Structures are given as C-alpha cells and as structure tokens.
Regions:
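Ubiquitin-like/PB1-type beta-grasp interaction modules and other compact soluble beta-rich domains
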Residues: 1-64
Length: 65
C-alpha cells in the first residue's frame, strides 16, 4: 500500500503502525507517532490500522542543548 511517512511517499506491506515502524527501520526506537494528524500512543500502535493513502508522522526526541 502507498502511504506517506514524514511527508515522503512509501510503499509498505505492513498494515499497522507498529509493523510499519519495523518495516521502515525504526524497530524499537523511542519515537512519537501520529496518523493523519492524530497522536498514536505507543501501546496503541500494534492495533492501529493504516490504510492506503494515510499519512504517518514519526518524531524522534532530540537531545542536547
């Protein structure tokens, strides 16, 4: 299916947020996620379905000062 990740087009086989994160290389990284502008908590990612055309945002925390 075709989705966008951080504004870039991606073709993925996975159908949940958690599986997509693994497929695109985030694995178990500590990140925040939003699907179509709505926050998706870490404990909801495994069940949160993603559909063709959806927009996934993945944000990693910054460190330093």
């Amino acid at each position: 299916m075709k989705i966008s990740v951080n504004g870039q087009p991606h073709e993925v086989k996975a159908t949940t947020v958690a599986a997509i994160l693994t497929e695109i290389g985030y694995g178990d990284a500590t990140v925040a996620t939003a699907l179509n502008g709505d926050f998706v908590a870490a404990d909801r990612r495994v069940n949160q379905a993603v559909r063709d055309g959806d927009a996934l945002e993945v944000l990693a925390p910054r460190q330093g000062g």
